[in-house]
Amino acid sequence: MGRKWANIVAKKTAKDGANSKVYAKFGVEIYVAAKQGEPDPESNSALKFVLDRAKQAQVPKHVIDKAIDKAKGNTDETFVEGRYEGFGPNGSMIIVDTLTSNVNRTAANVRTAYGKNGGNMGASGSVSYLFDKKGVIVFAGDDADTVFEQLLEADVDVDDVEAEEGTITVYTAPTDLHKGIQALRDNGVEEFQVTELEMIPQSEVVLEGDDLETFEKLIDALESDDDVQKVYHNVADF
């Protein structure tokens, strides 16, 4: 699974980096975190968390600085979080998390993306009950047992620790993600490939042929919306 998370980040960065959409989305997230607290990551843990993730996604420094400078200014632009759940082809399920300054615009855009690309937007809660919210931490390593013991000693609520091909993947309770990251830093981990709150599907489906092609177009349409921050799904090996 560790390779899965690292591959997802690499794939998304490569795809979005060409048109800078990932940078713009991080810019909004950084602005919101800085605006809601101090614009200093040393005194604002939410901002520090976003900046760490931005670093993993290779967001340029000038994008980060611009977002923080904007938060320091007198702008009163506000953003609202949203979630839209729906269905793709052949049993696939999708959760879309948004951060927007115009809820009506975003809701219409997401609904259109579903409808025009082989999907259907469902009611709130129609999909999310089949996913579990977890903290995911990925870094280089191969001793899962030692990592598990270190996290337990730090009183971190750990669901699982996996080691695969030189990569460690840690799953924590969502409330203990930051605590887990700090515990690993205290034990010498300096670089992380992934530090995210994720919605993990309780089971996965395999898509092939036309279904897979339709699903890929649907995900691309959803992720291309500027207000969409995260897209979760239950399709294996995608």
Swiss-Prot record:
Gene3D superfamilies: 1.10.10.200, 3.30.70.980
Keyword Cytoplasm: yes
Electron transport as UniProt keyword: no
GO CC term (a single one): cytosol
Gene Ontology process terms (BP): regulation of DNA-templated transcription
Pfam families hit by this protein: TACO1_YebC_N, Transcrip_reg
UniProt xrefs under SUPFAM superfamilies: YebC-like (SSF75625)
GO molecular function: DNA binding
Keywords in alphabetical order: Cytoplasm, DNA-binding, Transcription, Transcription regulation
Cell location: Cytoplasm
InterPro entries registered for this protein in UniProt: Integrase-like_N, TACO1_YebC-like_2nd/3rd_dom, TACO1_YebC_N, Transcrip_reg_TACO1-like, Transcrip_reg_TACO1-like_dom3, Transcrip_reg_TACO1_YeeN, YebC-like
Family designation: Belongs to the TACO1 family. YeeN subfamily.
Protein name: Probable transcriptional regulatory protein SAG1645
The organism of origin for this protein: Streptococcus agalactiae serotype V (strain ATCC BAA-611 / 2603 V/R)
